[in-house]
Amino acid sequence: MESGDELNQYSAMITDFIHNCREAEKGFISSQEWWILSGFVKVQIFLTSLNDNAELIVASNLFKYHVQNADINEYLLKLNGTLKLKGVCFGIRNKHLILSYIRPVQGLNPEELERIIAKIPVIADEYDD
């Protein structure tokens, strides 16, 4: 199977998943970008455009984080070092505190995709205070 075909296969899998979330507010940006609202958490889903090493990126902006706080940063780094986040990690992107999960698409199946997407709002709810 060609790398481009694999990326299209995973794009179709994600699109099918989003379509099956009938009640959820959602959006289709492109064949490589989607979003879904889970509670108050907007989960963004991306496929990289790298044909040979395509990756799935599932992320959410938690809040604006213009002025960084050393104590918060240290706490988040310590959380990232535990197993409590189940593969999800905190980070900073475009002056926002984010949660993200990155995985190569090789071997991804619909059940795992659903679990990955579901992790972000659960962890966001747990640590939003």
Residue ranges, per PLM feature:
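Charge-rich, low-complexity N-terminal segments
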Residues: M1-Q44, T82-L85, C89
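Ordered, soluble secondary-structure elements with a strong preference for glycine-centered loop motifs
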Residues: G4, N8, H66, G107-E114
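Hydrophobic residues embedded in beta-strands of well-ordered beta-sheets
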Residues: W34-W35, A54-L56, L97
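Short beta-strand micro-motifs enriched in acidic
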Residues: F46-L50, G91
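Short, surface-exposed beta-strand-loop junctions and turns on beta-sheet-rich folds
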Residues: N51-D52, K64, V105-G107
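Short, internal acidic amphipathic alpha-helical interface segments
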Residues: I57-H96, I102
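Well-ordered alpha/beta subsegment
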Residues: L85-A118, V122-D129
